[in-house]
C-alpha cells in the first residue's frame, strides 16, 4: 500500500483492523510484502506458456514482463507494459523475466484457486519487480494482482508512483462506454460513452474539499466486452483509475500518485488490485467485486421491510417550512400510499449544534415527540434529516469544540461548500460520541424511526493533521469514516432495531466501504432520469439482494414526474410534493407549476404508487446481465419476481421491436402495466420479441400463460 519494507513475508488473510495497522505502519516504512494474503495449500508447476488466471481470463507474461490479456482463449489486448514503477527520471517498464512460481490456493473465504508469481529485474534502473496473480474457482474472469518493487541499487530512487493493469483496448464499431466509481465535483454521470476527447483521472482521493471517495472500480467496454480494474483493500485507498480515449481505442489503469524515496534494499508494495474481463456492461464486474468483498467481510445489512416503503419528504416546503404545512400534507401522502414522512433540513438552528429551532418547535423536545406522534397517527413512519460532520460558522460547537475539526497539513480547515461549513474529523472519539448521542436522542427519545444522513461531504474526507487528535497517521480520518458510520448505524439500531439508516452523499459516487452501515441509498440528487437508472443498476450490482435503492424525489427526474425510472428498475419511490399549495417562502424561484399536487399530478402519482405497492419490484431479482445499458436500444431493465418477469424499456420515442430476454421456456402472457393493456402471448426459451411504440417508457409484465397476474 505504497509501503516500504525490507523483507519477504507471507501474511495471513488481511482484515480491516489489520489493514489499518499496516497503513499506519507504512508511513514509517515497515509494511511487509503481502503477495499471498490468501492461504496457499501447495506449490504447483508453473504454466509452460507463461500465463496466469483461468479459462475466462488469462494474463500472459513475455520476457520483458509485458503482459497480454486473453478472454476465453482469445486475445483481448496486445502486449503492453501493464505494471510500471514511476520515477522522477522516467517510467521503468521493462524487466527481464528471471523466475516464475505457482501455488495452489485453498482460502477459507474464497475457496480453491491458484496463484502465479513472476519475478524480473531491470538492470538499467536497478529494480526488481515481483508480480503476484491470484484467481479463485468461484470467480472466473477475475484476477487479483499485487506488485513488489525492490531497489537493488546503491542510491535512493525518487518514486513518483506506480501503475498496474494498464491496458488499451483497440477501437471497434460503436466505440466505448465507461463506468467510473470515482467522485467528481461536477456530479457527472457515472456511466458515459467515450467521446473523442474523453479523459478522466477518476481519483479515489478528494476531488475537492467536500467531494471524494467512491467505489474502487472502473471499466471500459465495447460491444463485445470489456475490462474492469480497481482495488480490493478493506479500507479506502487514494488511488486513481484513469480512463482515456486514445487514437487507437481506449485505455484504463490503476495508479498511485504518491511520491516517496526508495532507499537501497527497500521495497514498495502496491495495494491488492483487481483485473476483470466481462461481456456486456459494467454490471457483471461490479457484481464480481461485490461478491469478492463479501468474502473479505464487507457487505450491506439486510434492511427492514420498511426500507422498501414509499417516501414522502417535506423538502418541498424547504428550510423555511411551517410545521402546520407538513401536518396538512400528511393525510394526502397517506391516502396516496406513501408510508414514510421525512422531516428535512430546517428543523435545527444550524448544522453543527443540532439544537431544535424553537420558532418552529417552541416546546423543544416535547414538540419533536409530538411531531413523530402526529406522523404515526396518520399511519406513517417519521424519518429525520441530519448532516453530520459539518459545523457552521457561528455555531456553538465550532466555538466550544474547535478540537473536533479536521485540519490539513498546513492547519487549514476542510470546507463543506453547500452549507459554508467546516468538516469535523470522523476518527476523533469526541466527534463520534457527539453524533452517536444525537442519533440515540432522535430515535430513542424523539421517536423517529429512520435517519436520513445527507451531504456530499459524508462520502469521504481528507487526511487529518489536527495534533489534538493524536492520529497514528493522517490517513486515520480517511479509513475511520466507515467506522464512524458503523457507530451511527449501531446507535440507531440499538435505539430501534427496525430503524432505517439512509445515507445520501449528494452527487458523489457511493463509497463502497460505507456499505455495512447503510440500510438505504437514494440516487442522491440525480441530475437526470438517466442518473436514476444508471446509478440504480450500479447499486444493485454492489448491494445485490440486500439492496434498498431509492430513486430520490421524483421531482428531480426528467419532467419532474418520471416514476417509471424508479419503478421499472426496482427502486423505492419518493416525492416532495406539496399540498394543498406550495410554500410562499421559497429560497429560489419554484419551477413552472411548482411542486403542488394538482389534480393531474395526483392522478399520476396515485397510479404509480399503486403500481409500486402492488408489484414491489425492489424485492425481486434484478437481472442485470440481460441488457447492456450502453449499447442495447432501447435501454432495458429486467426483474424476476414471484414467477413473473418485468421489463421496462426507455427511450424518448420508440417504434420497433423490443426483446424480452431471459424468459424460461413456455408460453408467456405480456401486459402493459401502466396502460393496462394485454399485448399477447410470446414463447420463452429463445429471445422473445414484441412490436412496440412508446414515448419515454414501456412497463411490461410477463406471466405464464393461463396464470393469474
How would you describe each model-predicted region?
Residues 288-332, 336-340, 344, 348:
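An acidic-aromatic substrate-binding cleft motif
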Residues 266, 270, 485-679, 689-691, ...:
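Active-site-proximal substrate-binding groove within the catalytic cores of carbohydrate-active enzymes
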Residues 682-709:
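C-terminal beta-strand-rich structural cap/linker in extracellular carbohydrate-active enzymes
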Residues 16-23:
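N-terminal export leaders
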Residues 1-14, 27-31, 40:
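N-terminal secretory signal peptides
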Residues 46-242, 673-678:
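Polysaccharide-binding surfaces and accessory modules of carbohydrate-active proteins
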Residues 49-53, 121-123, 202-301, 566:
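Beta-strand-rich recognition/accessory modules
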Residues 340-548:
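Aromatic- and carboxylate-enriched substrate-binding clefts and catalytic-loop regions
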Amino acid at each position: 500500500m505504497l509501503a516500504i519494507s525490507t523483507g519477504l513475508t507471507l501474511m495471513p488473510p488481511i482484515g480491516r483492523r489489520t489493514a489499518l495497522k499496516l497503513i499506519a505502519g507504512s508511513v514509517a516504512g515497515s509494511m511487509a510484502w503481502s503477495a499471498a494474503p490468501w492461504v496457499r495449500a501447495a506449490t504447483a508447476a508453473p504454466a509452460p506458456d507463461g500465463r496466469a488466471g483461468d479459462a475466462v481470463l488469462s494474463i500472459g507474461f513475455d520476457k520483458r514482463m509485458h503482459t497480454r490479456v486473453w478472454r476465453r482463449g482469445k486475445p483481448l489486448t496486445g502486449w503492453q507494459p501493464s505494471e510500471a514503477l514511476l520515477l522522477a527520471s522516467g517510467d521503468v517498464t521493462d524487466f527481464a523475466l528471471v523466475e516464475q512460481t505457482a501455488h495452489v490456493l485453498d482460502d477459507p473465504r474464497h475457496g480453491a484457486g491458484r496463484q502465479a508469481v513472476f519475478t524480473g529485474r531491470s538492470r538499467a534502473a536497478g529494480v526488481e519487480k515481483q508480480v503476484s496473480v491470484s484467481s479463485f474457482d468461484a470467480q472466473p474472469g477475475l484476477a487479483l494482482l499485487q506488485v513488489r518493487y525492490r531497489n537493488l541499487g546503491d542510491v535512493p530512487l525518487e518514486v513518483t508512483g506506480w501503475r498496474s493493469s494498464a491496458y488499451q483496448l483497440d477501437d471497434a464499431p460503436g466505440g466505448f462506454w465507461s463506468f467510473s466509481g470515482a467522485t467528481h465535483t461536477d456530479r457527472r454521470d457515472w456511466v458515459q460513452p467515450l467521446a473523442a476527447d474523453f479523459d478522466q483521472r477518476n481519483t479515489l482521493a478528494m476531488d475537492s474539499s467536500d467531494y471524494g471517495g467512491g467505489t474502487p472500480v472502473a471499466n471500459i467496454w465495447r460491444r463485445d466486452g470489456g475490462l474492469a480494474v480497481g482495488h480490493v483493500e478493506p479500507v479506502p485507498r487514494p488511488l486513481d483509475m484513469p480512463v482515456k480515449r486514445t487514437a487507437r481505442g481506449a485505455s484504463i489503469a490503476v495508479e498511485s500518485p504518491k511520491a516517496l524515496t526508495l532507499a537501497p534494499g527497500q521495497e514498495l508494495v502496491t495495494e491488492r488490485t483487481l483485473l476483470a474481463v466481462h461481456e456486456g456492461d459494467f454490471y457483471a464486474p461490479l457484481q464480481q467485486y461485490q461478491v469478492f468483498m463479501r468474502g473479505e467481510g464487507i457487505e450491506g445489512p439486510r434492511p427492514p421491510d420498511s426500507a422498501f416503503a414509499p417516501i414522502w419528504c417535506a423538502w418541498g416546503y424547504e428550510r423555511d417550512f411551517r410545521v402546520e404545512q407538513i401536518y396538512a400534507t400528511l393525510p394526502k401522502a397517506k391516502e396516496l400510499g406513501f408510508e414514510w414522512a421525512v422531516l428535512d433540513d430546517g428543523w435545527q438552528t444550524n448544522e453543527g449544534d443540532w439544537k431544535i429551532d424553537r420558532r418552529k418547535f417552541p416546546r423543544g423536545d416535547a414538540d419533536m415527540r409530538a411531531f413523530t406522534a402526529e406522523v404515526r397517527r396518520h399511519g406513517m413512519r417519521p424519518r429525520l434529516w441530519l448532516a453530520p460532520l459539518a459545523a457552521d460558522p457561528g455555531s456553538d460547537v465550532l466555538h466550544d469544540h474547535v478540537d473536533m475539526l479536521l485540519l490539513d497539513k498546513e492547519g487549514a480547515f476542510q470546507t463543506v461548500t453547500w452549507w459554508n461549513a467546516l468538516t469535523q474529523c470522523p476518527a476523533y472519539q469526541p466527534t463520534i460520541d457527539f453524533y452517536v448521542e444525537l442519533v440515540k436522542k432522535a430515535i430513542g427519545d424523539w421517536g423517529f424511526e429512520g435517519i436520513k444522513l445527507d451531504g456530499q461531504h459524508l462520502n469521504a474526507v481528507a487526511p487529518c493533521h489536527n495534533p489534538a487528535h493524536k492520529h497514528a497517521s493522517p490517513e486515520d480520518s480517511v479509513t475511520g469514516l466507515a467506522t464512524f458510520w458503523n457507530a451511527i448505524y449501531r446507535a440507531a439500531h440499538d435505539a430501534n432495531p427496525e430503524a432505517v439508516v439512509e445515507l445520501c452523499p449528494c452527487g458523489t459516487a457511493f463509497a463502497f466501504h460505507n456499505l455495512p452501515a447503510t440500510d438505504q441509498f437514494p440516487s442522491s440528487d440525480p441530475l437526470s432520469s438517466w442518473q436514476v437508472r444508471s446509478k440504480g443498476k450500479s447499486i444493485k450490482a454492489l448491494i445485490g439482494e440486500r439492496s434498498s435503492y431509492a430513486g430520490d424525489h421524483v421531482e428531480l427526474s426528467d419532467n419532474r414526474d418520471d416514476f417509471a425510472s424508479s419503478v421499472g428498475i426496482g427502486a423505492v419511490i419518493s416525492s416532495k410534493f406539496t399540498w394543498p399549495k406550495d410554500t410562499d417562502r421559497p429560497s429560489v424561484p419554484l419551477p413552472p407549476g411548482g411542486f403542488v399536487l394538482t389534480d393531474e399530478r395526483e392522478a399520476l402519482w396515485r397510479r404509480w404508487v399503486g403500481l409500486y405497492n402492488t408489484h414491489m419490484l425492489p424485492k425481486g431479482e434484478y437481472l442485470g446481465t440481460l441488457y447492456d445499458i450502453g449499447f442495447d436500444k432501447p435501454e432495458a431493465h429486467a426483474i424476476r419476481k414471484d414467477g413473473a418477469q418485468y421489463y421496462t424499456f426507455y427511450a424518448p420515442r420508440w417504434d420497433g421491436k423490443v426483446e424480452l430476454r431471459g424468459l424460461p421456456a413456455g408460453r408467456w402472457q405480456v401486459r402493459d402495466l401502466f396502460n393496462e393493456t394485454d399485448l399477447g402471448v410470446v414463447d420463452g426459451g429463445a429471445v422473445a420479441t414484441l412490436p412496440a411504440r412508446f414515448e419515454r417508457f414501456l412497463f411490461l409484465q410477463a406471466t405464464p400463460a393461463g396464470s393469474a397476474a
